[in-house]
Amino acid sequence: MNRKDIKRKSHQECSGKAGGRGRSRQARRHKTCPTPREISKVMASMNLGVLSESSCSEDELLEECIRCFDSAGSLRRGDHILKMVLTMHSWVLPSSELAARLLTSYQKAAKDAQELRQLQICYLVRYWLTHHHEAVHQEPQLEAVISRFWTTVAQEGNMAQRSLGDASSLLSPGGPGPPPPMSSPGLGKKRKVSLLFDHLETEELAQHLTYLEFRSFQAITPQDLRGYVLQGSVRGCPALEGSVGLSNSVSRWVQVMVLSRPGPAQRAQVLDKFIRVAQRLHQLQNFNTLMAVTGGLCHSAISRLKDSHVHLSPDSTKALLELTELLSSHNNYAHYRRTWAGCTGFRLPVLGVHLKDLVSLYEAHPDRLPDGRLHLPKLNSLYLRLQELMALQGQHPPCSANEDLLHLLTLSLDLFYTEDEIYELSYAREPRCPKSLPPSPFKAPVVVEWAQGVTPKPDSVTLGQHVEQLVESVFKNYDPEGRGSISLEDFERLSGNFPFACHGLHPPPRHGSGSFSREELTKYLLHASAICSKLGLAFLHAFQEVTFRKPTFCHSCSGFLWGVTKQGYRCRDCGLCCHRHCRDQVRVECKKRPETKGDPGPPGAPVPATSLPPANCGSEESLSYTLSPDPESGCHLRHAWTQTESSHSSWEPEVVPCPARVLPSRASSKPSV
């Protein structure tokens, strides 16, 4: 028996004896590296230095910060404690109270003639204002206390101390600003930049989405993160609310762009394009936008489109499943966390996952121990998580952005849709099949709209600015000769970037020159964007110009509808009446009435809008706009919206004779004949 056999036999005997005692020996690591959690714990305790105990008082913490500075204003040791206190104190102590304690300490040191301590306190306040200037402007009470502090220094301090309070050297901006948009390399002056979604390369689209995401991520401050953790909501945190709104906008934009295509094969092309965009986002390590795009592709309103998914290639289907697995919430996003831990260089996190970690860490331990002292390890752990996120804001994106394409994406993401509207459009594209179908292979990785209620609905001023920027970009690239107009073909392709076609907001037919001026394009985009962004589809009334037989009043301004013929407009679905100039300002939801039997009665009766009888097409001129349910037809969806223009307007709607009143269904209706 050789030596190895002897050792093996002895090990077996030992294990047998242990098993005989009925208690298995616990496996112990031997000569192995510590886990990352253990390394982080040790490093955190080392960074705390003399405050490595589990608790300390506010005065002890403040005293340690004062001692960090020497007589020349240099840090005697590392700045970890100083940065942690200045970043995290507002979690347990108002900033104005911290400043008041510094003022009291300075006055006491001046009374005892401790000039070095006075100077150290001045250095601390100066460091605070220089590196955390945004906190001062957000708290008026803190500004008042700081002002009193420097007034006291001017009265009781020496020349060296007073020089530190020079306002011209304080409040310097901290951190890099958002990256400036740059034109694509090699872009000549006469070369047109394609502003068409179908012409945008997946690489280009992913880069511009990454730029928008990084610009939004850079605006988030530690105060925003603290507000979310303490309140459990993004309300009151504009930068964080904007970041969440951007993610939700991207997700819904993906859904509506897919549903805006009439045929399954066309929808599959859009699906395939967004899958390739998601793959490129993965390569760019932009996980937040990747989550939004993948969530939009896996949304139940999209995954139920069986006819569309049939046209996807096996490679695209496999890629989507892999991305879904990467962002799955299974085991607390274990797959994503492993991938994120191995990332280096430029990267953007899934913000919702990391905010969830902050909330869990905050709720796990109390702020103070039973004796009233601060729980220092908790504050330090929260600071390390915040510092990790803040460090990512100083990155430099690996890609450039074209300003014109940014304007296009910005306006596209401004559009607002509710879940009900998206589902309604999904069922209009592919109605329910009575036969049982196999379940969809796609699983939603998470609830994409992780902050519910955050809906990106811009105000009219912001929307107008975005439209003006886009129109300027369009004419810069599509009208290089400066004629002041673009062709009908360019107009139709440009309007195809937006899912207006889903709601009857097609480019209006043109007569004569067939070109569109800057004013006409601006009017079209403002009109369509305002409806889709601010009112939502439920507010769209099917207005028609009518002649009232009885005295009728405008529902919007309460004015009398007077005239000989065609005094105003009335909605075909709910019966609401208004002036021509008031129809775009109606803020009442269109509630479609159930179909009634018998004589509907005379039109124009002053009864509530929800119970007003339908129009009699035999006695009034009416315009009918219906939604074609055939997804494969070559025609556009015909127009179940409309805040219609009059027949002599530059946007002339299609006139369809209406011999009999037939109420269309909510999802779709048969074309009028």
UniProtKB/Swiss-Prot annotation:
Metal-binding as UniProt keyword: yes
Classification via SMART domains: C1, RasGEF
Zinc finger (Phorbol-ester/DAG-type): 540-590
Signal peptide (residue range): none
Compositional bias per record (Low complexity), positions renumbered to this chain: 164-173
Domain Ras-GEF stretches: 201-432
GO-annotated molecular function: diacylglycerol binding; guanyl-nucleotide exchange factor activity; zinc ion binding
Tissue-specific expression: Expressed by mast cells and their progenitors (at protein level). Expressed by dendritic cells.
Identification of the protein by name: RAS guanyl-releasing protein 4
Gene source species: Mus musculus
Lineage of producing organism: Eukaryota, Metazoa, Chordata, Craniata, Vertebrata
